[in-house]
Amino acid sequence: MLGKIALEEAFALPRFEEKTRWWASLFSTDAETHVKEITDINKIRIEHADKHGVGYQILSYTAPGVQDIWDPVEAQALAVEINDYIAEQVRVNPDRFGAFATLSMHNPKEAADELRRCVEKYGFKGALVNDTQRAGPDGDDMIFYDNADWDIFWQTCTELDVPFYMHPRNPTGTIYEKLWADRKWLVGPPLSFAHGVSLHVLGMVTNGVFDRHPKLQIIMGHLGEHVPFDMWRINHWFEDRKKLLGLAETCKKTIRDYFAENIWITTSGHFSTTTLNFCMAEVGSDRILFSIDYPFETFSDACEWFDNAELNGTDRLKIGRENAKKLFKLDSYKDSSA
């Protein structure tokens, strides 16, 4: 399929090459290739995209990114630097690339202002944030965005009419030591990423964020970070138990309603037709978006799987590009009508 849109595609600042190399050594079997791919924007990426039928990519800063910086001033300065940098890069090939804003999430008003700057000045397509913001004197605290203090930020998202991508980050500090240190091979895609994001997004559901901001659009990667597979059980306990005990005060709709109206999932890093079909049955093809998770995953694995998956033509087009066109209000790009 030509003209696919991919929207969980990472980059890193070239000046952090050594840090990126060290980070890559923790998970990549070819750290040097990873460094080259994640710091490149307009050459290697486009070559891969041309070969595999990806017409447009929305780029975002690699995890853990700014969410790993617990000093608010340093975090904000880096977010601005990243946004200014990627704005210059995507301007080279605007028919191939867009960008998500990188945000320091220490202060909701500051985050809202930076998002507005990126959308209004640069035309960014929304924001991607790597789960909770590390905070406190030693970085061991976590800031969640699922309480009323963050209403000013979510209101800005809806005013700008742009989505927010809740991406994972690695567990740190006390949480890492108590839960993951003795189970280090479960950190990341095998388990910890889904734990973090599903907790955060379901917290937004139960704490009434979507009821207060009914037009808010949230994206979850990796086919929904396990939530679609627990949809029946979550719905059963919310509706038949928790709401009778008080959840109804803050959570007015069903979990299925929120997935139909506020939550999207992507195929990033999860290239299974069986799993995709299950998610289509639970949340519908209208709420699923193609993505790769490059360079942590490859264009070839993602695209060859998707192009050859047993899907009907309508669903392939929806997931591959048409849903994203509508969500991000995209104009013409390479092979957008192929």
UniProtKB/Swiss-Prot annotation:
Q: Give the record's GO CC terms.
A: cytosol
Catalysed reaction(s)? 2,3-dihydroxybenzoate + H(+) = catechol + CO2
List the keywords (alphabetical). Decarboxylase, Lyase
Enzyme Commission numbers on file: 4.1.1.46
Q: In which pathway does it act?
A: Aromatic compound metabolism; benzoate degradation via hydroxylation
GO terms, molecular function: hydrolase activity; o-pyrocatechuate decarboxylase activity
Q: Does the keyword Repressor apply?
A: no
InterPro entries (alphabetical): ACMSD (IPR032465), Amidohydro-rel (IPR006680), Metal_Hydrolase (IPR032466)
Instruction: List the Pfam families.
Output: Amidohydro_2
Task: Quote the Gene3D superfamilies the UniProt record gives.
Answer: Metal-dependent hydrolases
Q: Which residues form the active site?
A: C251
- Any one Gene Ontology BP term: benzoate catabolic process via hydroxylation
Fill in the subunit field for this protein: Homotetramer.
To which protein family does this belong?
Belongs to the metallo-dependent hydrolases superfamily.
The record's annotation in PANTHER family points to: 2-AMINO-3-CARBOXYLMUCONATE-6-SEMIALDEHYDE DECARBOXYLASE (PTHR21240), AMIDOHYDROLASE FAMILY PROTEIN (AFU_ORTHOLOGUE AFUA_7G05840) (PTHR21240:SF31)
Q: What does this protein do?
A: Has an absolute substrate specificity for 2,3-DHBA.
Protein name per its UniProtKB record: 2,3-dihydroxybenzoate decarboxylase
- Organism (species): Aspergillus oryzae (strain ATCC 42149 / RIB 40)
